[in-house]
Amino acid sequence: MKRIIYAISLGVLLAIPVLSQAIDTTPMIRVTNVHNGQSDESLDTFTETKFFGPYQFRVLKDAIETQGETKDIDGRVFRTSDGVFMHVKARSIDGNSMSLDNEIKNLVKERTIPEPTVKMVLPIKDSVIEVNNDGVRSLLAEFMYGWPLKNRTDMVLVTDYEGTRYYDKLQFYRDRLPNGVRIEQLREMIMDAQFSYK
């Protein structure tokens, strides 16, 4: 009887480290970004969560993942029939990389110069919002374009996290929003980009 009890005790002692390792290897923890004290729970009804490396982001449920749309995209690209376009990409940062603020300044500067192939593509408004996602600092640059793209809005969320810089971009046309989706919800969608970690 003592041998049986000893064997069971030994088995439990050996199993505990294995179980703890199994728990440790589950890296995904869902966190929800609350921007300005608000969280839109209805996002779950028309969006779904995707993962890109350790990055967690939202796309519209009817979005189809596409490839090769533009040369500068090296991440994942999604497009809906409503004209909503979203892509996520990540790149490593070296020690000489510019700060997050300077990255945004360059982004704003680049987008206020007309594209060579399109006339008069100038933002009529651009703004930068700081977003704090569970202690991780992100900057959201939003652009509303003038003629001929007067109804287009682009949003780019840029984040540094553990040595990697992440870009989350959403582009849509305000006269062709997805059915039942408000512009504020699309904005919340990109700001809800989160990290799954630990």
Predicted regions and their residues:
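Positively charged n-region of N-terminal signal peptides that target proteins for export
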Residues: M1-I4
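Acidic/proline- and glycine-rich, intrinsically disordered low-complexity segments
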Residues: F78, I104-R111
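Short, conserved charged micro-motifs
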Residues: S97-N102
